[in-house]
């Protein structure tokens, strides 16, 4: 069986935790920040666990 290749786009956007969950960064936190409240901007810089529906696909994209 051939080696599994890591999806490079996914590897730059997602990280695997020690328990096997996939973590992602939030969107909308890079620019046009003047109209967003401080509380929202703080939350946008926290990483979150990826959606349950996407976990199976992401685990296949990030085999190692």
From Swiss-Prot:
InterPro entries: Ribosomal_bL35 (IPR001706), Ribosomal_bL35-like (IPR021137), Ribosomal_bL35_CS (IPR018265), Ribosomal_bL35_sf (IPR037229). Pfam families: Ribosomal_L35p. PROSITE patterns: RIBOSOMAL_L35. Keywords: Ribonucleoprotein, Ribosomal protein. GO terms for cellular component: large ribosomal subunit. Coiled coil: none annotated. The keyword Ribonucleoprotein applies. Signal peptide: none annotated. Transmembrane segments: none annotated. GO terms for biological process: translation. GO terms for molecular function: structural constituent of ribosome. Belongs to the bacterial ribosomal protein bL35 family. This is Large ribosomal subunit protein bL35. It comes from Solibacter usitatus (strain Ellin6076). The gene is rpmI.
């Amino acid at each position: 069986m051939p080696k599994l290749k890591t999806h490079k786009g996914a590897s730059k956007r997602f990280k695997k935790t020690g328990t096997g969950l996939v973590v992602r960064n939030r969107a909308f936190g890079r620019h046009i920040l003047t109209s967003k409240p401080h509380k929202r901007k703080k939350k946008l810089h926290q990483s979150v666990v990826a959606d349950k529906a996407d976990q199976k696909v992401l685990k296949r994209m990030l085999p190692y």
